[in-house]
Amino acid sequence: MNEQLLENLIKQDIESIFTQILIKHNYIFPISAKSRSGAEISDYLEDGFVEYITKNPHERIYNPKDAPKGATKNPYDFCFNYKHPESGFDDLIWGDIKATKFSYADSNPDLGTPEKIIKFIMDGHFYLLFVFLEYEATEDNQTKFLAFEDGRYVHCQFLKDIHHSVRINPKPQFQVNIHEPEEYRTRDEFLKLFYTKYKESIDRNIAKQEAKKADLDSRFDSMLQRLKTYNDKINHDH
């Protein structure tokens, strides 16, 4: 099995599991569908993923884990090992759940820091998988999941296949509109895109800092004049 077929199989397996979790709950979670309820939804789904694999052992997925509760800086929402003997593949994969409120049609969620990805690759791994879902609030303020335009409730996408419009923002975090389609590329091609986007981000930050630096003399000259006025006022009052 070639690289792309294996990646498609991984996505199909994970999509199937999360879809089964939604079906079990009739596509409704007892969570208040606030604008920022994504983290609570993620916790619910992470637990559901681990529980599902534990109760329904999978021929290719093993050692499922969810993120430690309360750990805001955890590098993944859930993770698992995936083995496919025919391809000689057996590796750790990180999962990141992105549940977005339907009213936010142009949502551009943060998709992880560059340094997190670099460390993951340097540790001998590669695949970060996003699980995209959309939801809305029910009349009794619960969370109801919605089907995407293609009728599916769950979209899985590897970071490596992210749309080329992705940018790395000043935080820095990968960022792209969730409705941009995925674009298949090889692992090597992703590394080239990653390098280009990270360099562009750093260059933008340098340009901003250089502009601030260039403006520093005039700003402090202005403050010095203000301070002289202030000192004169204080001395005059006394």
What label would you give each PLM region?
Residues 1-74, 80-93, 99-238:
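Nucleic-acid endonuclease domains
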